[in-house]
Design a protein with these regions (language model features):
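N-terminal lobe of the biotin/lipoate ligase/transferase fold
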Residues: 2-5, 17, 40-221, 252
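Intrinsically disordered, low-complexity segments enriched in glycine and mixed charged residues
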Residues: 6-10
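Low-complexity, glycine/proline/serine-enriched flexible coil segments
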Residues: 13-22
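Basic polycationic patches enriched in arginine
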Residues: 21-26, 33-36
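Long, positively charged amphipathic alpha-helical accessory segments at protein N-termini or as interdomain linkers
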Residues: 23, 31, 41-62, 66-75, ...
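Active-site glycine-centered loops adjacent to acidic/histidine catalytic or metal-binding residues
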Residues: 173, 236, 266
Length: 392
């Protein structure tokens, strides 16, 4: 649980964690954005009303049911019903005769009302209906097979760009090349994001880099990990040379256009590194798992982390639209492979595609490799293994 204790600009906000510099929700934004989200059908009236109640409780020491009902045009009984739902979602709300209701603690889980409040109150995120808005509709599940599978179904059903599916646990989580992705229930952050980009299939390589940039910037700047954050082509996010986040992008393509893209992101948020290493240990040439919580030395607020990731990804997608070359330059600042001796295969233990020194990425997002014979190869896909060399 995170105590509602920090006061920023006169408004109490959820304490995120040491290291995650969570911006206080902009309450002046929340109400207008809630109305717009309702008009667009991006959230239900119940979630919207409970988000309003949370915002009001955060903005005041305490409020009576009568005051809340009057402010929102609902009965005291309806107020009590909404508060009961919030309590069942993990919010600790104090109710005292003569003093009213006050919010004491927020849940660690990324429940819809808390995520909606943080999302709509974040000035970095465009408003619902504006280009670049991400995060709604929001689907929060206790357990699914895979959030990517859930999001693929939503995509085919016509859900709009920006739809997010989050799960506390996955029974069939997967990464690139059909590898198993393991995450601990209630500890880590696993979610999928639906995009409907106006891209040609050949441009998907740059989209991968843009998403990776957004995640890296969130961890480096918002979480405060700085130079400890790196990117291993194409989209592994490293912290202190260990893998802290995996990204899986799946797309539906019709001839010369991309219908939709589902971006699955798994972050080792609060698991300990010792809990993530399998019985067989880390394969040679591969990165051991890393944990954000271990790196910052405290638990991470998953709701705050999710919203910050979405805001950073939104900005990266805007950069991709406005200046594709800037995406490559941004990526190069995080490139953890450049200058390393690598082997590129069709899969772990698969057919060798290239061997040499990684030399950055091309304008289309492909990996540039300077091979031992002096040639230069360009590769749009493959599995990278870092080889041990003398002095390294």
């Amino acid at each position: 649980m995170y105590t509602i204790a920090d006061t920023v600009g006169g408004a109490q906000v959820p304490l995120a964690c040491a290291g995650l510099r969570q911006r206080a929700p902009r309450f002046d934004l929340v109400e207008n954005r809630l109305e717009r989200g309702l008009q667009l059908g991006l959230l239900t009236p119940g979630v919207a009303q409970r988000t309003r109640l949370l915002a009001r409780m955060l903005d005041s020491a305490s409020l009576s049911g009568e005051e809340m009902g009057s402010a929102f045009g609902i009965s005291r009984a309806a107020v009590h019903k909404h508060i009961s739902v919030l309590r069942s979602a993990g919010f600790v709300i104090s109710s005292q005769r003569g003093l009213g209701h006050s919010l004491v603690e927020a849940p660690e889980s990324p429940v819809p009302e808390l995520v909606t409040l943080l999302l709509l109150g974040d000035p970095r995120m465009p408003a619902p209906g504006e280009a670049g808005f991400l995060g709604l509709p929001y689907h929060h599940h206790a357990e699914v097979g895979s959030t990517n599978d859930v999001c693929r179904g939503l995509a085919e059903a016509g859900s709009p760009e920006g739809t997010v599916a989050v799960a506390e646990a996955q029974s069939a989580g997967r990464g690139r090349l059909d590898r198993i992705w393991c995450s601990r229930a209630g500890q880590d952050l696993t979610f999928s994001l639906l995009l409907r980009p106006g891209l040609a299939p050949v441009e998907l390589g740059l989209l991968v880099l843009a998403i990776a940039n957004g995640v890296a910037l969130c961890l480096a700047e918002d979480v405060g990990l700085g130079s400890a954050v790196g990117l291993k082509w194409p989209n592994d996010v490293l912290v202190n040379s260990g893998k802290a986040c995996g990204i899986l992008m799946e797309a539906s393509i019709d001839m010369d256009r991309v219908r939709w893209v589902v971006v699955g992101i798994g972050v080792n948020a609060n698991s300990r590194c010792s809990e993530l290493i399998g019985v067989g240990g880390t394969p040679p040439g591969k990165e051991p798992p890393a944990s954000i919580g271990d790196a910052v030395g405290s638990r991470v607020s998953r709701p705050a982390l999710l919203v910050s990731l979405l805001a950073r990804i939104s900005a990266s997608l805007h950069q991709l639209d406005a200046e594709p070359g800037a995406v490559v330059r941004q990526y190069e600042g995080f490139d953890a492979l450049r200058g390393r001796t690598i082997r590129l295969t069709s899969g772990y233990g698969g057919r060798e595609l290239a061997r040499g020194v990684a030399d950055g990425v091309e304008g289309d997002g492909s990996l540039r490799v300077r091979e031992a014979g002096g040639g230069v190869g360009f590769h749009g896909a493959g599995e990278v293994t870092v080889e041990s060399v003398a002095g390294e």
